[in-house]
């Protein structure tokens, strides 16, 4: 249809142009109102200095069925005429829009809201040239470059100028010079200042995980964006592209090693029987005779697939988490207020989270607050303060950790689910790849970039390699990803919340050890989580019955077995509305936050307390974020003290302590013999008068104690740790003193160590009777035996009674143990 820059007349296309112009000049949403619907588009184009007119395709379908069928079936053919109709409409309605300075200014047409949205696998050669919508996930975006639309060429032989040569998806020169005396066909110079260029961007789109058939790999497709819709699709967005399918040469296939078949005619072998069918290698005559083609998609509109398909297309650039409450209708706002006014609505919101999982209310509450998030802030220096909440779930196998992650990834519009074992550092953050067509390096988004302004769920977090864990340090706190490689230096945004699940070391959580010994994660990463929850699979008859009953009901009745107070749609809408609020701290809440943080720090330094990790300023910031999220859940614009108290309780239940069992030391008291008569060697700290009064009752007391020895010796884990720490510190102090003069062994006799501890407790007025002293001596002997035989924290340096007679050893077994010299194991580190 092109000849020397002109076009052959297409009667049907001209008819489509006229009917489309009539549609623009006469369409009204309300027949009773005089104003034209698309006349407002002209004002929007003028106000935003735009060149794009957005057309709702449902309006075209309601106006003229023949017109919508022609556009849908042969869009690529009629697209220049539709653009011309838009330009004529703008000039007729506003003649001053096209000024003398820009006589060639075009108005581009963009369709949206098509009745059907196809999957990527449904795009076949039958769709070439048709107007279709396709949905997928953006995985890669190129930089914006200028594209030559209409070229102006100068003949190098005669100097003639040929204008408006349309480019057919490749660099297209005139076929022959317009001068009748010039026969030039190949020697041309492009006049760039007189040619027409447009912004151009290539986007790689991939199938969503829900659309991939079983056993298949996800397919991808290149999408070409032009004019104003460039930079509207970001990596990680699930988008709806509207446009047409075209066929372009597959350059990467031609550039690969090996021969590629081309169909060409060789004049030197015209008489040969094989003429015209020889294989030719390389990129010669690209796009003309090569046989390797692939599909591409030229889009004219971009929509974010978040359920709001009828939103204003022009507000896409500002469509982040801004407080835009105008996106909710009056009915939706009424429904949100009804949910807010429901009695005990916060617990009902929590109960509606992950209804297939029984119990775990604290974790559901943490996930809800993570979805709501805190408020992002920026300091005067331009430093961003994180508002997203990170949550880590550590638990035994089969505790529904992955169910929480799957549910969270499904309820959030922008989310990524990945596994830590199969994820590398580049796969989580970003990688630098080479463009196959240009050879230039570009950045390809990883999981954290794809989840920007969303949530990244990482399963098997503890299985990641150390070098891969280090890569997400910056992303978890500063929420940026810095890349310096292959000549590219960039800082990318990763404003995402991280929900991680990890298994404890050895498969089961050991309550007798702190969290840092139970999970294979460094303290630097643990401190970046606002909430760390531990799920322990303890046998409990009542709980096990309810869990089994719930699971069987779900398998039997499916959705009918679940009866959450609020549906998933209502929950999504409530969370979306709550995120538009930006609550501020009240003076009372600010004061309570400071007091709570000081109390947490005080508890962190108290000897004998068990904490998951050190209380730092990060935990104070976590309290602020949690308080803001709780205020959002209540639809409050002010953080109250009650919100802070709930945040403190959540932090305490998550990181301060884990319900730990008592320690049974019965086997070690049996090993010691534990005859209370052996305490004679240890000085009695209680007054002598009490000793005389109790002297007559000594035989009976000994008999009673022998009976008590048969009982179990059980102490709490906190007491065990407190006594252990005191003994180790005393031994270390003595070791440092001995090392200075080196005149004696760097250890303390066991009975002297016990006597020192009893004296220390007596100075604090801990004892009121002789029985308490004897009980503590029994505990100390059992704990020391455990530290020597089981834990290995203490070692025996010498025992002066080793060479005593065997009978004497049997008679005074406990006394012999009291004579041994103890020291701290060299590899033991005090917590």
From Swiss-Prot:
Composition bias type Basic and acidic residues, residue spans: 259-268
Regions of compositional bias (Acidic residues) in chain numbering: 675-692
Catalytic activity as recorded in UniProt: ATP + H2O = ADP + phosphate + H(+)
Pfam families the UniProt entry points to: MCM, MCM6_C, MCM_lid, MCM_N, MCM_OB
EC class name: hydrolase
Residue ranges of the region described as Disordered: 258-278, 666-705
EC number: 3.6.4.12
Compartment(s) where it occurs, according to its Swiss-Prot or TrEMBL record: Nucleus
Gene Ontology biological process: DNA replication initiation
Cross-referenced CDD domains: MCM6 (cd17757)
Domain MCM, first and last residues per copy: 345-551
Any GO molecular function: DNA binding
Any GO CC annotation of this UniProt entry: THO complex
Short motif Arginine finger, span: 527-530
Keyword Amino-acid biosynthesis appears in the UniProt entry: no
SUPFAM superfamilies: Nucleic acid-binding proteins, P-loop containing nucleoside triphosphate hydrolases
Heme found in the keyword field: no
Tissue-level expression: Expressed in shoot apex and flower buds.
Key words of the record: ATP-binding, Cell cycle, DNA replication, DNA-binding, Helicase, Hydrolase, Metal-binding, Nucleotide-binding, Nucleus, Zinc, Zinc-finger
Subunit field text: Component of the minichromosome maintenance (MCM) complex, a heterotetramer composed of MCM2, MCM3, MCM4, MCM5, MCM6 and MCM7. Interacts with ETG1.
Family: Belongs to the MCM family.
Protein name: DNA replication licensing factor MCM6
């Amino acid at each position: 249809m092109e000849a020397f820059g002109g076009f052959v007349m297409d009667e049907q296309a001209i008819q489509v142009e006229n009917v489309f112009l009539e549609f623009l000049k006469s369409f009204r949403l309300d027949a009773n109102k005089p104003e034209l619907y698309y006349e407002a588009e002209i004002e929007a184009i003028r106000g935003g200095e735009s060149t794009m007119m957005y057309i709702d395709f449902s309006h075209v379908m309601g106006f003229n069925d023949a017109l919508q069928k022609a556009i849908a079936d042969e869009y690529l053919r009629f697209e220049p005429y539709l653009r011309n109709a838009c330009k004529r409409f703008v000039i007729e309605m506003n003649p001053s829009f096209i000024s003398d300075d820009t006589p060639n200014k075009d108005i581009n047409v963009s369709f949206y809201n098509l009745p059907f949205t196809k999957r990527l696998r449904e795009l076949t050669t039958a769709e070439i040239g048709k107007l279709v919508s396709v949905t997928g996930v953006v995985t890669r975006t190129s930089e914006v470059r200028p594209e030559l639309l209409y070229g102006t060429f100068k003949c190098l032989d005669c100097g003639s100028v040929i204008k408006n040569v349309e480019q057919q998806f490749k660099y297209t020169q005139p076929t022959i010079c317009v001068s009748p005396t010039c026969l030039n066909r190949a020697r041309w110079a492009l006049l760039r200042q007189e040619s027409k260029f447009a912004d151009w961007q290539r986007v790689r789109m991939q199938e969503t995980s829900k659309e991939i058939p079983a056993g298949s790999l996800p397919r991808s497709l290149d999408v070409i964006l032009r004019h104003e819709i460039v930079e509207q699709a970001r990596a990680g967005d699930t988008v709806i592209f509207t446009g047409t399918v075209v066929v372009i040469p597959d350059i990467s296939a031609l550039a690969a090693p090996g021969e590629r078949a081309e169909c060409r005619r060789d004049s030197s072998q015209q008489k040969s029987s094989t003429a015209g069918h020889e294989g030719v290698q390389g990129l010669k005559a690209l796009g003309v005779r090569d046989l390797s083609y692939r599909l591409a998609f030229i889009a004219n509109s971009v929509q974010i697939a978040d359920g709001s398909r009828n939103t204003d297309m022009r507000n896409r650039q500002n469509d982040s988490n801004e407080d835009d409450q105008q996106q909710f209708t009056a009915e939706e706002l009424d429904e949100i207020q009804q949910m807010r006014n429901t009695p005990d609505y916060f617990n009902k919101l929590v109960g509606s989270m992950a209804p297939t999982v029984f119990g775990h209310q604290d974790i559901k509450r943490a996930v809800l607050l993570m979805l709501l998030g805190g408020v992002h802030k920026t300091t005067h220096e331009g430093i961003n303060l994180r508002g997203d909440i990170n949550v880590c779930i550590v638990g035994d196998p089969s505790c529904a950790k992955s169910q929480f992650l799957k549910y969270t990834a499904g309820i959030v519009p922008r989310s990524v689910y990945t596994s830590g074992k199969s994820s590398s550092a580049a796969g989580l953050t970003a990688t630098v790849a080479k463009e196959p067509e240009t050879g230039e390096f570009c950045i390809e988004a990883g999981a954290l970039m794809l989840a920007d302004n969303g949530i990244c769920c990482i399963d098997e977090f503890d299985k990641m390699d150390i070098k891969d864990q280090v890569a997400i340090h910056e992303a978890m706190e500063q929420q940026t990803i810095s890349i310096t490689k292959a000549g590219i230096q960039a800082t990318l945004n990763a404003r995402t919340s991280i929900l991680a699940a990890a298994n404890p070391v050895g498969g089961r959580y050991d309550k007798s050890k702190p969290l840092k010994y139970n999970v294979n994660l460094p303290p630097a990463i643990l401190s970046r989580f606002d909430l760390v929850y531990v799920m322990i699979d303890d046998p409990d008859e009542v709980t096990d019955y309810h869990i089994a009953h719930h699971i069987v009901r779900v398998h039997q009745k499916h959705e009918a077995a679940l009866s959450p107070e609020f549906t998933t749609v209502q929950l999504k809408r409530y969370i979306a509305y709550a995120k538009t609020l930006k609550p501020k701290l009240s003076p009372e809440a600010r004061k309570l936050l400071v007091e709570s943080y000081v109390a947490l720090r005080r508890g962190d330094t108290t000897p004998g307390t068990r904490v998951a990790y050190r209380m730092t300023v990060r935990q104070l910031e976590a309290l602020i974020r949690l308080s803001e999220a709780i205020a959002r859940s209540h639809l409050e614009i002010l953080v109250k003290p009650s919100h802070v108290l709930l945040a403190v309780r959540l932090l305490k239940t998550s990181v301060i302590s884990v319900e730990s069992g008592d320690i049974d030391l019965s086997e070690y008291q049996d090993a010691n013999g534990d005859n209370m008569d052996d305490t004679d060697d240890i000085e009695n700290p209680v007054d002598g008068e009490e000793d005389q009064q109790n002297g007559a009752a000594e035989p009976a007391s000994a008999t009673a104690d022998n009976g008590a020895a048969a009982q179990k010796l059980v102490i709490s884990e906190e007491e065990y740790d407190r006594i252990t720490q005191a003994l180790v510190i005393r031994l270390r102090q003595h070791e440092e003193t001995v090392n200075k003069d080196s005149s004696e062994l760097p250890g303390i006799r066991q009975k002297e160590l016990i006597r020192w501890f009893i004296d220390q407790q007596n100075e604090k007025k801990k004892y009121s009777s002789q029985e308490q002293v004897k009980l503590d001596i029994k505990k100390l002997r059992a704990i020391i035996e455990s530290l020597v035989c089981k834990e290995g924290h203490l070692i025996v340096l010498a025992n002066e009674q080793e060479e005593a007679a065997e009978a004497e050893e049997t008679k005074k077994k406990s006394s012999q143990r009291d004579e041994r010299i103890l020291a701290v194991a060299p590899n033991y580190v005090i917590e």
